[in-house]
Amino acid sequence: MAGLKSLAKDTAIYGMSSIIGRFLNYLLVPLYTAVLPAASGGYGVVSNVYAYTALILVFLTFGMETGFFRFANKAGDDPKKVYANVLMFVGGLSLAFVALCLTFLHPIASFLEYPDHADYVAMMILVVALDSFQCIPFAYLRYQKRPIKFAGIKLFNIVGNILLNLFFLLLCPWLYKVQPGLIDWFYDPDYLVGYIFVANLIMSAVQMLFFIPELRGFSYRIDRKLLKEMIAYSFPILIFGLVGILNQTVDKMIYPFLFEDRQEGLVQLGIYSATSKVALVMAMFTQAFRYAYE
């Protein structure tokens, strides 16, 4: 009975943090559509870049979250050794990804058709590498049955990101008009889209600090046999994950290519992405009502 109560409590914490997090993230949509000029295609750029990062995040985690739980709960395997090996694998893969992408940053930016904004691409490379690595400590918190810290970090990241967006997109433009001398040393009024990525990068870096306790006290030695087994187990999960995320994001990747004018494609993508977010929230409320009514 105690186990069922604990399960119900953990489910409530994970579920509420997920629902609240999604709703808070949705609040950024009206902010972006109000602040970013429609003709600039700014929100289209944001949607397009985040679509690529979602795909890369799945690749870099390599299905190792599920693999970690499988082997950490397997009789005969040391959970700490499993965790350390997963950390080293995902961390090494993320570092290699960052090094490779930053080396070929400008060709990648040109391929994605952001030749004048390689900085956007660079920031999101760092963000997706940090986020993929942090997926493993998050999994470790779940394994240790610590839902409060898990949910607290998630919500802190979301709230912090929202506050930074409000700072860069609302407060800074106002200060720039009334007292430009206060912020003109770091603020560029024409860099609004870039500040969205800056806010994300700041919060991803700050979030890393919360995981320092989950990174200490482990023996970081590669067990080749164990790692080989985990990779073999996780690889099919990676494939299914890539297929699943492509189903959710491929539209935002290819949308700009459907137009002869790239800029017009980004404008239309921004409209499309904003309306799809509205539909998503409506679906959440509809589902909640249906559950209550039935």
Name each model-derived stretch.
Residues 1-7, 176-195, 208-248:
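Interhelical loop/hinge segments that connect adjacent transmembrane helices in multipass membrane
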Residues 8-21, 80-81, 121-127, 141-169:
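Alpha-helical transmembrane segments of multi-pass membrane transporters/permeases
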Residues 96-114, 172-184:
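Short membrane-interface helical motifs at transmembrane helix boundaries
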Residues 34-42, 144-152, 158-207:
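Membrane-interface helix-loop junctions in multi-pass transport and translocation proteins
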Residues 2-65, 94-102, 127, 162, ...:
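Signature of the first transmembrane helix
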Residues 60-76, 275, 279-294:
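Helix-loop junctions and terminal segments of transmembrane helices
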Residues 55, 91, 95-99, 103, ...:
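Alpha-helical transmembrane segments of multi-pass membrane proteins
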Residues 7, 19, 68, 139, ...:
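C-terminal transmembrane helix end/exit motif
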